[in-house]
């Protein structure tokens, strides 16, 4: 799949957002014959952080009757806010708030260096969470708790404006050679893309620690309180490869995530289990398989990238794959990473594909009632 330009998430955990937007920009570039362009990651990130703050505060209200050492309450206070995420965040935010070109809301120091901002907002959210629990324990009615939460979100909004800038409500833009028009973020998205990100895409997982050909849902794994939890079909790796190859052959990029730190040769941009011989060096073996690594929290989905190419042998079987990364053009192989099929088997976890590339038998699995997994499941890991 052809691409134009490499993006750079800088010192932030926004790979999930860059990846989702890179998938969408490739569609827009192809559709309108555009040169290199980007959507504003900062615009989407602003509302992502605001919605996550609301998700946390409402979660605190919902669990206010439980003790502080309840596992869900503990999990909430350990995860008030992060800059990481998944494809659910891409769909949750864009479906509600739309998109803008990067020129309409550029990056800031804090959007490119999210650590301090996220820590400060997270600290404030924990303080607010305690206040909401105290109010609920004192018998404050739900309608009054909602008012308190809304006021708290006003504080978060101000913190986000100070660090990321205020989101644009309207802007003027045109295609090259076209007449400039005024858009809202939602009207811009609907006119130029308009994809139903919630219903037109299928989230696929390769998790050998769970039963295959089942639908799973991870609780609280979403970016909006009224959004959709990460709900996926768990498939054998060969099934996922067939879907990915069909998409690439049709020049359609995919959201893809993996455990990128394993056996990465960053200078060559190569992911291969044979890159390093740790067993000879240490005089021992490392025998856990993929299932065991998942069960022991030794491996999981840590980074999202855009799956864009595959090298097939004469029999049509994959030999290696290529992804567009978001670490800048100087990283890896001209901003890309290449992975052997052997590495793909061991460290690939998630692919998000358009429904038209997914067999009917897999789509039928989505009709099952999902098996609900807790928020602290090994497969709930923000991609950063």
Question: Model-found features: residue ranges?
Answer:
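Active-site signature of cysteine proteases
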Residues: 140-384
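Papain-like cysteine protease catalytic cores
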Residues: 41-174
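Structural recognition of the beta-strand scaffold that forms the well-ordered cores
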Residues: 17, 43-46, 90-92, 101-104, ...
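Phosphate-handling active-site elements
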Residues: 27-41, 317
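Active-site nucleophilic cysteine motif
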Residues: 10-24, 81-88, 303
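Sec-exported extracytoplasmic/periplasmic mature domains
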Residues: 20-29, 95, 99, 249
